[in-house]
Curated annotation (Swiss-Prot):
Possibly necessary for replication. Residues 296-328 are annotated as: Disordered. Keywords: DNA replication, Plasmid. This is Uncharacterized 36 kDa protein. GO terms for biological process: DNA replication. InterPro entries: DUF1424. Residues 299-310 have a biased composition (Acidic residues).
Length: 328
């Protein structure tokens, strides 16, 4: 799942995917991490949050979606749809979109597979440089972005289950692919394992795939182009739409385990994009006041309810891998 540091502290992972040894703290295998993720997910799906109405004492239980549930993915899909719809209303026919794809090598120098967590760290290590390059590239232009981390599939060129980034850029006015080469270069320079050949904005060989695609945002009354780039990105986010995490293919579950183990969020919108993705406010004032009082581990309010104080600090679910110094 993650490589062991030669000395000192390494990756910060969920405790469920770490093991104490005589030589510090190491990560479990990927197979064990997937199994532990599946157990955690099943427990989460069975558990209901219990809230109580302050005046009547009525109690209601509900399941809270985590970022791996179909409900959460459906919510993100709806948010992505509203993003481009809002920008189209604001910019009209001036809205153009670009999709920039960022990857990193999935193999070690000796040809062996790179641990999923190490690869994810490599991929994300360039993010601040990528953002700075994007801002510089589109200086004096109005733009927003939506970055989504997705798993590779068996249909791709490399092994399935590793992460890659689709960066959707929404620009007021025309853009061309060549403009984004500096963004790709920033990723290559700041991400270990990011190859230059895989990050070319324009390619001459038809057999190669460019890392940038440009589209003019389609209008509802036109058939050409992609109707909604935001929704197009979200539709490919981490598995088939509406399917439970435990029913996903093995490569998606491995990807989920890496995201869960590291606490990585796969949806990264710009501040302006977030504003367009917010739901419309409800002007009606609610007179009911609900307070969380506990959880029902088996999902039955008539059964055991464990009281929870929402003000009580929670234990940190993470810890770092560690290798003590010689003699330590």
């Amino acid at each position: 799942m993650a490589s062991q540091p030669e000395e000192g502290f390494g990756e910060r992972l969920r405790k469920e995917v770490t093991v104490d040894t005589s030589r510090g703290v190491r990560a479990t295998s990927t197979a064990q991490a997937v199994e532990n993720f599946e157990g955690w997910y099943a427990d989460q799906r069975d558990t209901q949050m219990v809230v109580e109405e302050a005046t009547t004492g009525e109690r209601v239980g509900f399941r809270t979606p985590n970022r791996f549930t179909p409900e959460y993915r459906e919510m993100l899909y709806a948010k992505a749809q509203s993003l481009e719809r809002g920008l189209r209303e604001e910019w009209g026919d001036l809205l153009h979109t670009a999709m920039v794809t960022l990857t990193a090598s999935t193999t070690e120098e000796d040809g062996g597979p790179r641990p999923l967590v190490d690869h994810l760290r490599d991929l994300l290590s360039s993010w601040s440089a990528v953002y700075d390059a994007l801002r510089h590239t589109l200086e004096d232009r109005e733009f927003e972005y939506l970055a989504i981390i997705e798993p590779t599939t068996p249909a791709g060129n490399g092994p399935a289950g590793y992460a890659h980034i689709h960066l959707g850029v929404f620009v007021k006015g025309p853009v061309v692919a060549e403009q984004f080469q500096d963004v790709l270069d920033a990723h290559v320079k700041n991400s270990e394992g990011a190859g230059r050949e895989a990050h070319r904005a324009v390619v001459e060989d038809d057999e190669d795939e460019a890392a940038v695609s440009i589209r003019r945002s389609a209008r509802p009354d036109r058939e050409d182009g992609i109707e909604n780039l935001g929704a197009y990105l979200a539709a490919y986010m981490a598995g088939e739409y509406g399917v439970e995490a435990l029913a996903m293919p093995a490569h998606v579950r491995a990807f989920y385990a890496a995201m869960w183990a590291t606490g990585t969020q796969w949806f990264r919108p710009s501040n302006g994009a977030q504003r367009h993705m917010q739901p419309e406010s409800d002007d009606e004032e609610s007179v009911e006041e609900w307070e969380m009082v506990g959880i029902a581990p088996e999902g039955d309010l008539e059964d055991e309810i464990i009281e929870v104080d929402p003000e009580q600090p929670r234990d940190d679910p993470y810890r770092r891998l560690r290798t003590p110094p010689p003699g330590g």
